[in-house]
UniProtKB/Swiss-Prot annotation:
Annotated keywords: DNA-directed RNA polymerase, Nucleotidyltransferase, Transcription, Transferase
GO molecular function: DNA binding; DNA-directed RNA polymerase activity; ribonucleoside binding
EC number: 2.7.7.6
PROSITE patterns: RNA_POL_BETA
Gene designation: rpoB
Name the UniProt record assigns to this protein: DNA-directed RNA polymerase subunit beta
């Protein structure tokens, strides 16, 4: 995108790191051709590959648009006539009839044309990546039988990119899946506070429509609430549905409470019951039998007003045992549903364990757990957009009905009836403003991938932070294998936002399923069944690491299993139904990338998972020495690496593109992204990892992206770490770094900022982008070209002009001389002011790209804009004091000191360590994983050789017996290197070039003080830890101001870096000044340094002229206080010490105006001033 990039493309040399090998031992890497040879400590064979990590997004959108791939999958699943989401909406809407029923309009066959522009062009030109949607509309005149059919354009429909994102107005966005309570019937149990009786209630919750609630109160009567209105006896509703007293007695005669309710019910028959319900629902309106009948029918039995949705119908049938085995057709309530719900409630209250339904089926009678994943479902992207289209279509329906009545019947065509504006507006509103359509997190590939797999309980129709209690936020046994128990935010959203587990998938009803291996008669098979949380509760499940023999039988007679509600016990192997497919089944992608997760406290693991998403792409990426085997799949599915689509031979390679000659004779060119800006200002750059003539297979990674190396996720650096205190400089999580990391750009990152300016038409004339700027020296204009735009490659710092622009000034009455000049020189003498785009305060860098859009070149620009210029400035940020670093175990800290390399502690062979962490950061935080990672990192870096067959190495595979230095390893979560294996390998490491082993078998080494050369008194843990540089950079936080913008009302400086604000001297700081008796300092702080508007200009003048500081005046906030008191009708006057009234002058002082004019400054800038004007 950015032409003329002058940044060096740092590519790692092939000798630097181990090269690709097609036979990686990790179960994950082995399935990808050309995967790096990462040897794995995994002991378990996984029968199932990790599914596509973006399927939750892509499959859902394919359902919405009815894509061919989705149709094939649906037919294979057994759906006779699969319907896409758009088709469903059109079928619901059709036909739209006029009020008399003489005309109707129906819609069918939604289809898309080609997308208007490719993804890159949409990002570049602020366009939406969308395809035109067409439907077939059919108008039928029922009086004449005339049919008119037309293809109607329904607006541009945003399309999903291959990466599962949307491009809306040039920015990449993600639609987050929403966790909501499923429609259905829910039984609850509460204890009455006064009588301590157990009360029961039931809610019938639809997808759309009125709620129906039944309950048994403390007087043992059964009541009903319709649409949250007043409670009335349940028999009133039954009578309104046409039941007689005899029928009620016959069905519910077994229940005393139903009989007592019937006795207390004083309505005589169906008509009275209907009128009674009508009075409760519509108080104040005159009731009639017909209106009451219509109201009840509309509330629950008409599809237009009431919709349980397929999932609600499925849940009701399942709970009440109705229509077993029948296909789901209706989505409204039925009389049978209401009666069965009441019977279930009554039997629940009477403590009966089961209920026999009319079909002879027995269903268990029990209350529901609302937080169970059998009762919570996902609204994925397709359903969220479908709901929004439904809203737009219903608005359009009203317009169509009105037009049917007003237009001439002969002239009506579908096109004249349809107004697509409400539909287009509804879709735009959803993508632009919905809480679930979010600006994509593009800090690094992992953060983007995690964002697409996020599950949110917030949003429209969901929970709110304030109302959500502890239960809904807590980890639930049914989350196992569905939602990660670790990865969730730390703040007010904790537990409300989660992440999909690695193997989880979403079924057609929106429930999350997780896979299990079928166990038959104690033999574990490779047959995979996906189970929802409800189905899993009915089975006995063994964990993935249960020992099994060669024939697949459980090695032990009794197996550790879990049953319903997460109860854990030992049972005979013959009772086991299923077994987990993988130990990492319960965690998310980010959590699965934490090695030795099983040794970390959950709170710290949560921080580790979250902080990996904040890692900044470094200039040189480096894959971890100690990984988990998840790095490759995560990087490929994140979509930031380039993958070969077909097998073939590399024909040509350059920094910008790779050409592959496929085996089928076709040629494919892959373009690299070069130094593009991500949504978060980090640098997205791709570079080839293949050479011309190399053979590549389909699915092989041929170019690395940001934060990847050899196709694996590489978020940080492997650094030599010593865990020890050092002169107190690493107290309280501070970190000491070696200057080598600064000098050799080890932790250097590139950040790209985008600066934009447009030239508009104003009331006084058009703005102009030009080099001809008033009152600016040639030095300032040196880097601008003839158009007034900065040249590529220019070094700029804050205040420098990036794009010159002048805006016409408001004209005053012209003098005769000015009129003469205007007559002679024409427009040239017009007054203009400098409104150029300048580098904001505190920023600097190198200009790496410029984009110019102009109306003259037929570029699409907003109304009133003639020209738009974007300038991209790249900044190379070396690591510095105040930057935040973190490991993968929640071990984070701020750099407290950067020491010269020669002062760092060093190993006996003279190797200085890179980073010193404090020992106190480990014990109380209980993240021991970082210590084990450090030890294994040293083993991997040094290489190892295991002689003989020691007891601890019995279970190690052959490839782990010996390895050369720099061997990358993986230790999968819950199936990684054991403590005794680690201890054994530490004593088998290869010696260095002098034949010495630096680190002992306990993982410690004798370190020497770099300043004195003396050894430290105790051995120190030394090894390699994977350290990430986080997005919290000191350069973004440090801020200084002398003068700047002030608040309009109080005239006090604004606050915060973004507003170029000042430092607040608050109430407690004033007390400190009072305590020290610093009266003059305090007076200065409260007046001339704050909001004494006249005083601050006079002080500025005195400083410039070298005079003494004048007396302060009256602060503006005091005048505001007076005005507030006067607004309360209090007459407040300011008196001098001798009782004379002091007049507070309004407006600006004459002295102020004179001084400001003489100095050529404007110190009373208000908050409307932009930061650019301050430089």
């Amino acid at each position: 995108m950015l032409e003329g990039c002058i940044l060096a493309d740092f590519r790692q040399s092939k000798t630097d790191r181990p090269q690709s090998s097609s036979n990686g031992s990790s179960s994950l890497n082995g399935s990808v051709p050309g995967a790096p040879n990462r040897v794995s400590f995994a002991k378990l064979r996984e029968p199932l590959e990790v599914p596509g990590l973006l399927d939750v997004q892509i499959d859902s959108f394919e359902w919405l648009i009815g894509a061919p791939r989705w149709r094939e999958a649906a037919i294979a699943r057994g759906d006779a006539e699969p319907k896409g989401g758009l088709e469903e909406v059109l079928d619901e809407l059709s036909p739209i009839e006029d009020f008399s029923g003489s005309m109707s309009l129906s819609f069918s066959d939604p289809r898309f044309d080609e997308v208007k522009a490719p993804v890159d062009e949409c990002k570049d030109k602020d366009m939406t990546y969308a395809a035109p949607l067409f439907v077939t509309a059919e108008f039928i005149n029922n009086n004449t039988g005339e049919i008119k059919s037309q293809t109607v354009f329904m607006g541009d429909f945003p399309m999903m990119t291959e990466k599962g994102t949307f491009i809306i107005n040039g920015t990449e966005r993600v639609v987050v899946s929403q966790l909501v309570r499923s429609p259905g019937v829910y039984f609850d149990e509460t204890i009455d506070k006064s009588t301590e009786k157990t009360l029961h209630s039931v809610k019938v919750i639809p997808s759309r429509g009125a709620w129906l609630e039944f309950d048994v109160d403390k007087r043992d009567t059964v009541g009903v609430r319709i649409d949250r209105k007043r409670r009335q006896p349940v028999t009133v509703l039954l009578k309104a549905l046409g039941w007689t007293n005899e029928q009620i007695t016959e069905r519910f005669g077994f229940s005393e409470i139903m009989m007592s309710t019937l006795e207390k019910d004083n309505t005589a028959g169906t008509d009275e019951a209907l009128l009674d319900i009508y009075r409760k629902l519509r108080p104040g309106e005159p009731p009639t039998k017909e209106s009451a009948q219509t109201l009840l029918e509309n509330l629950f039995f008409k599809e237009k007003r009431y919709d349980l949705a397929r999932v609600g119908r499925y849940k009701v049938n399942k709970k009440l045992g109705l229509h077993a085995g029948e296909p789901i057709t209706s989505s409204t309530l039925t009389e049978e549903d209401v009666v069965a719900t009441i019977e279930y409630l009554v039997r629940l209250h009477e403590g009966q364990p089961t209920m026999t339904v009319p079909g002879g089926i027995e269903v268990p009678v029990e209350t529901d757990d609302i937080d169970h994943f059998g009762n919570r479902r996902l609204r994925t992207v397709g359903e969220l957009i479908q709901n929004q289209i439904r809203v737009g279509m219903s608005r359009m329906e009203r317009v169509v009905r009105e037009r049917m009545t007003t237009q001439d019947v002969e002239a009506i065509t579908p096109q004249t009836l349809i107004n697509i504006r409400p539909v287009v507006a509804a879709i735009k509103e959803f993508f632009g403003t919905s809480q679930l359509s979010q600006f994509m997190d593009q800090n690094n590939p992992l953060s983007g991938l995690t964002h697409k797999r996020r599950l949110s309980a917030l949003g429209p129709g969901g929970l709110s932070r304030e109302r959500a209690g502890l239960e809904v936020r807590d980890v639930h046994p049914s989350h196992y294998g569905r939602m990660c128990p670790i990865e969730t935010p730390e703040g007010p959203n904790i537990g409300l936002i989660g992440s999909l587990s690695v193997y989880a998938r979403v079924n057609p009803f929106g429930f999350i399923e997780t896979p299990y291996r079928k166990v038959v008669d104690g033999v574990v098979t490779d047959e995979i069944h996906y189970l929802t949380a409800d189905e899993e509760d009915r089975h006995v499940v063994a964990q993935a690491n249960s020992p099994i023999d060669d024939k697949g039988r459980f090695a032990e007679a009794r197996v550790l299993v879990r049953r319903k509600a997460g109860e854990v016990e030992y049972v005979p192997s013959s009772e086991v139904d299923y077994m987990d497919v993988s130990p990492r089944q319960m965690v998310s992608v980010a959590t699965a990338m934490i090695p030795f997760l099983e040794h970390d406290d959950a709170n710290r693991a949560l921080m580790g998972a979250n902080m990996q998403r904040q890692a900044v792409p470094l200039v040189r990426s480096e894959a971890p020495l100690v990984g988990t085997g998840m790095e490759l799949r995560a990087a490929i599915d994140a979509g930031d690496v380039v993958v070969a689509e077909k097998s073939g031979v590399i024909e040509e390679v350059s920094a910008d593109y790779i050409t592959v000659m496929a085996d089928d004779g076709t040629r494919h060119t892959y373009r690299m992204r070069k130094f593009e800006r991500s949504n978060h200002g980090t640098c997205a750059n791709q570079s080839p990892i293949v050479d011309a003539g190399d053979r590549v297979e389909a699915g092989q990674v041929i170019a690395d992206g940001p934060c990847t190396e050899n196709g694996e996720m590489a978020l940080g650096k492997n650094l030599l770490v010593a865990i020890m205190p050092w002169e107190g400089h690493n107290y309280e999580d501070a970190i000491i770094l070696s200057n080598r990391l600064v000098e050799e750009d080890v932790l250097t990152s590139i950040h790209i900022e985008e600066h934009e300016i447009d030239a508009r038409d104003t009331k006084l004339g058009a703005e102009e982008i030009t080099r001809d700027i008033p009152n600016v020296s040639d030095e300032v204009l040196a880097d601008l070209d003839e158009r007034g735009i900065v040249r590529i490659g220019a070094e700029v710092r804050d205040g420098d002009i990036l794009v010159g622009k002048v805006t016409p000034k408001g004209e005053t009455e012209l003098t005769p001389e000015e009129r003469l000049l205007r007559a002679i020189f024409g427009e040239k003498a017009r007054e203009v002011r400098d409104t150029s785009l300048k580098v904001p305060h505190g920023e600097s860098g190198k200009v790496i790209g410029i984009r110019v859009f102009s109306r003259e070149d037929d570029d699409e620009l907003p109304a009133g804009v003639n020209e738009l210029v974007r300038v991209y400035v790249a900044q190379k940020r070396k690591i510095s004091d105040g930057d935040k670093l973190a490991g993968r175990h929640g071990n984070k800290g701020v750099i407290g000191k950067i020491l010269p390399q020669e002062d760092m502690p060093f190993l006996p062979d003279g190797t200085p360590v890179d980073i010193i962490l404090n020992t106190h950061g480990v014990p109380r935080r209980m993240n021991i994983g970082q210590i084990l990672e450090t030890h294994l990192g040293w083993v991997a870096k040094s290489g190892w050789n295991i002689d003989g067959n020691p007891e601890w190495a019995v279970n190690l595979p052959e490839e782990l017996r010996h390895a050369q230095p720099n061997q990358i390893v993986s230790t999968p979560v819950f199936d990684g290197a054991k403590e005794e294996e680690l201890a054994g390998m530490l004593s088998c490491t290869l010696p260095n070039r002098d034949g010495e082993v630096m680190v002992d078998g306990d993982g410690k080494a004798v370190l020497f003080d770099g300043r004195s050369g003396e050894p430290f008194p105790y051995p120190v843990t030394v090894g390699y830890m994977y350290i990430m540089k986080l997005h919290h950079l000191v350069d973004d936080k440090i801020h200084a101001r002398s003068t700047g913008p002030y608040s309009m009302i109080t005239q006090q400086p604004l606050g915060g870096k973004a507003q170029f604000g000042g430092q607040r001297f608050g109430e407690m700081e004033c007390w400190a000044m009072q305590a020290y008796g610093a009266a003059y300092t305090l007076q200065e702080l409260l007046t001339i340094k704050s909001d004494d508007t006249v005083g601050r200009v006079k002080v500025y003048e005195a400083i410039v002229k070298g005079e003494n500081i004048p007396e302060p005046g009256i602060p503006e906030s005091f005048k505001v206080l007076l005005k507030e008191l006067q607004s309360l009708c209090l007459n407040v006057e300011v008196l001098s010490s001798d009782g004379a009234a002091i007049e507070l002058r309004e407006g600006e002082d004459e002295d102020l105006e004179r001084a400001a004019a003489n100095l050529g400054i404007n110190l009373s800038r208000n908050e409307s001033a932009s930061v650019e004007d301050l430089a």
